[in-house]
Amino acid sequence: MAKKVTGMIKLQLPAGKATPAPPVGPALGQHGVNIMGFCKEFNAKTADKAGLIIPVVITVYQDRSFSFILKTPPAAVLIKKELGLESGSGVPNRTKVGNITKEQIRKIAELKMPDLNAATIETAMSMIEGTARSMGVVVVE
């Protein structure tokens, strides 16, 4: 018989650096999940992705066990990593912070493809381009 789901928790955590401190502790504690167990498992699975923010969806079951699914990092994080930026522009319509090429966008789109609601790589690329523009990054050919 399948386990009964009692909760779904969505978090964005730095890869390999989950600790029982907020936001992890309070989010999992209210569902009665073993916080250290989650932190150890998450850190082990994301150790190779250091420096990235990893979204995770945690499913909590009635017997207080859990399972989690790792998603791909947000597009904005991947764009900042690709261009070596600290942050995007506060006023993207006036201040531009960098340039990104179509090849770099294709690389990010291919990485994000499993989590994007896009049928083709071209639509995924246009989504990533929109994110880049809203960060103050100019898309060049």
UniProtKB/Swiss-Prot annotation:
Q: How is it modified after translation?
A: One or more lysine residues are methylated.
Give the Gene Ontology MF terms in alphabetical order.
Answer: large ribosomal subunit rRNA binding; structural constituent of ribosome
| GO CC, alphabetical | cytosolic large ribosomal subunit
In terms of Pfam families, this protein maps to: Ribosomal_L11, Ribosomal_L11_N
Q: Which SMART domains match?
A: RL11
SUPFAM superfamilies referenced in this protein's UniProt entry, alphabetically: Ribosomal L11/L12e N-terminal domain (SSF54747), Ribosomal protein L11, C-terminal domain (SSF46906)
Q: Which family does it belong to?
A: Belongs to the universal ribosomal protein uL11 family.
What role does it play? Forms part of the ribosomal stalk which helps the ribosome interact with GTP-bound translation factors.
Q: Which protein, by its recorded name, is this?
A: Large ribosomal subunit protein uL11
